[in-house]
Every structure is written in C-alpha cells, then in structure tokens.
Amino acid sequence: MLMERRTAATADILLLLEGTFPYVRGGVSSWVQRIIEGFPDRRFGIIFLGSARSDYRRSVPYPLPANVDYYAEYFLYDEMDSTAATGTARSRLDENAIHDAHLEMKACLKGEGFLRQDSGLAENFGVTREDFLGSSDVWNYLLQRYVEIPDQPAFVDYFWTVRSMHAPLWTLEKALRAAPRTKILLAPSTGYAGYLGALLAARLNCPLIISEHGIYTKERRIDLLLARWIHEDEEFLRRPGQIHYLRQLWIDFFEFLGRFAYQRARRIVNLYGGVIPLQLEGGAVEGKLLTIPNGIDVESFVPARRPLVQRQDAVALIGRVVPIKDIKTFIRTADLLRQEGRKTHFWIVGSSEEDEEYHAECQVLVEHLGLQDCVHFLGFRSVLEILSAVRLTVLSSISEGLPLSVLESFAAGVPVVSTDVGACRELLYGAASAEGEAPAGIIVPIADPPALAAAIAALLDDEERWSFCSRNAVVRVESQYQEKQMFERYRRLFEEVSTE
C-alpha cells in the first residue's frame, strides 16, 4: 500500500472512488481534492477501488488531506492472480436462487423492474469465490447457460469472461464488510464505485449521492467496443453491426451496475443539463436528478492572462494520454498545420502512465509523421505555467463531461477549440446565447483533423477574433463556474439528504 491506511470507525462523508484520487491525475481527482478541502468542517472517508495493485506502484500525486479520517484501498482484479481458493466450496448451492438473481438482473437491464432490497446480487449472485472455483453446481450452471447462447463463443473464453466479471464483486464484499459508518455516501461515478455505494446505502441505511462527471456506462461501452483484449472468433458469421456475445456481455454488465446504483441513489448529480436524457435512458428517475456544474478558483489563474502577442506560438492539449482523449487526432491535426508551413508547437500535457501502450502508439505516430520537432509530450506540468504560455488549448476527446481543463483555460483568458462532446458546446458558446453570439472558442466534429486544424488556424491568424473569444471566456467562467458557487450547491445538497 502506497497510501497510509486510516481506520476511523465513522465519517461524515464516505467517498467511493474508482481509478481516480489519490493515484491518478485528472479532472475527477482534482474535483475530489477540492471537495475535501472545500469542506474542512466535514470528516471524510475514502474507499479507493483500483484495477490491479501493480498498476499503482508509482508515486502518489495527491496526499490525503488532514480531514480524511478513513482510507482503505481495494484492487478489483488481484483476485484473478491466483487460481487457488482459500476457503471451501459449499456442497450444495441453491441453483434456483442463483437463477432468480440473474433473471432479476436481466429485468433490471430491460427497465422492467427494480432489484429487491435484499437482492442476492449483494452476495455476488449467491456465489463465493470458493464456490466458483470448486463447486460442481456452479460448473453445471455455467454449462447450462452456455448451451443456451446463440453463436456460441469458445467455452474457455466464456468461462474466463464470467470469472472476470465476478472477481471484482468478491473484492467489493470485503470493502462492504469493512466500511465505516457514515452519514452520506458520495460516488463520482456508477460502475463498481456506484455499485458498492448502492450496497452500502442499504447496509448502513444512509443516503447515496452519485455525482457523475461523465456517463460511466457510455464510456465503458466505448472502451469495450474498441477493446482488443476481448477474444472474438467467427467474425465473418456475424451480421453487420452485430456485437460479439462476450463484448455485449461486458456492456450489459456495466449497464446493470449503473442501473443498480441509480435505483439506490438518493440524488444523481450531473454537470450540465444536456446529459439528463442519457441518465434517464440509463435508469435514473427524473425526481432524483440535480445539475451542479464544476467550478474552479478563478482568481488563481488571473496571472496567466495576457494578450496574444505576448504568448508563445504553441497550443496545448491538457489531458491524460488515453484513447478517449483521442490524442492521435491532435497529432494528425499538428501534421496538417505543419504542412501549411506553420512553426507552431503542439504540447501534450498530461500523464502517460494510465495506458502506456496507447502512449507508445502516439509516439510512433509522431515519429512516422516526422513531427518530433513540433509535437512534445510534456507529462504533468503546472497548468498555470502552461496557460501563461500557450495561445490556445485543444480538446480532441470522443467523450467528456464538463472538462476542468476548459474552465481553467477560460480563467486564464485562453480560447479553446474542442470537439462537440459533453458540455463543451455549452461552455464555448454559452447555454442561452445563439451559437457564435459570444463564443469563447470553436466547436468541431469528433475525429476530424481537417476541421480541428482549420479552427486552430482561424483563431491563431485573427488577433481580433482571438481577443474577443478570450474576453468571452473570462466573463463566462467568472459568472457561472466559480468554485464558491459549486461549494454552496453541494453544501445545500449535503444538508438536504441528511434531513430527509
């Protein structure tokens, strides 16, 4: 354990964090840190859920604040490292109960019912790790389900997929048993964190708030559709557009986790109104929904404000080097602009540790295009220093919520060119104004390097337009996205759920 364990028996607010704070830099982690530090009168607990312990051996970027009294970490896929079970499988399992639990999950996915408060899913579909690895009843049940599958995948792939789905749930049971008592549960996502929150809400009889920074099920669907680790055979037998059974099984699993969390949540917070239809489609109830935009400490970015002529001929993409940020489109955009004879430099500012394979692919692309002299991977840097220097920031993502990097750019008076994802259109053009009336940058389609290059060039080549966007950016962030506004909204929310 890189972080010291803290073991208080109670907490005012228990944060349930999957793959974010304190190990991974990014917008959600920054939000977590600011929530903890913004409420010094509250005592916090943290349950961190990671993938495998080996993924978190590097330094910890976020030290625990003094008002964090409980900290525990669990690694969801460490159970996969061992084939030996430490306990004993039961001689007979209630196959009907297991079957009913799976039917209940399917009904939940179809929106046909709600899970019982005492759902067997809380006990991992009624199957312990020892049962899964050592029970003939579980083996026979898996065989029965397998023969019912149309266009069957290889059984070995089916078995390991099902085991991989169950393994994190066995780990979550440990977190469930060890968690401290708390007044409020707060999870910034559905997924495993939201699922654990739903179970804890029932066990501790306390309210769960899900504060979504992106639609977890949507992002996992994108990841799974792009994933190369899911083995697919007989691809030529599938209809066009048909998703392989195992890939769809994973998608359904994460959709179920999301619906389960939505059902048990007292409040479901979103960052902007445009995401509400997706939340409703995912099983949220309209009466639970609440919009609280991100906010930042605007004053801290004032020193970065300066006119275009005092800035370097550079644009920056501030974000993690991961597929969902579509760094490759940014690199291809740099290539198009370099072909025009521009001397602009393109900075990629963010951690490359989360997906080292993708980072390597991006580096190969830079070398293949001969862009080593103008595309630079800077790693983590002071955002204030970067925003003091660059002329534009760029967001090439294929999915976002309400990106903190855009708000920080605005606070520094730096216009933004962004893909049309999440709240970015609302941020750049304003929620109530007509498109182009008071722009703080330019919106472009996803995965469109020519459009991205044209937008960057349009702002770099027109100082008057750049200055107009810069002024609009500052006005918008100062009036609508102040950190103090966000804190006040959360303070009211905490008080409301505590008294209901």
Task: Please place each PLM-identified region on the residue numbering.
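Nucleotide-activated donor-binding/catalytic signature segment of Leloir-type glycosyltransferases, i.e.
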Residues: 237-244, 359-380
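Carbohydrate-associated surface elements
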Residues: 274, 295
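Conserved donor-binding/catalytic core segment of Leloir-type glycosyltransferases
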Residues: 305-336, 347
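Short, structured helix-loop element that forms part of the nucleotide-activated donor/catalytic region
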Residues: 340, 345-372, 465
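Aromatic "clamp/platform" in nucleotide-sugar-dependent glycosyltransferases that forms part
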Residues: 398
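Short hydrophobic beta-strand element within catalytic cores of glycosyltransferases
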Residues: 415-418, 422-429, 435-436
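Conserved acidic donor-binding segment of nucleotide-sugar-dependent glycosyltransferases
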Residues: 430-449, 458-463
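A short, well-ordered alpha-helix in the C-terminal region of glycosyltransferases
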Residues: 440, 451, 458, 465-480, ...
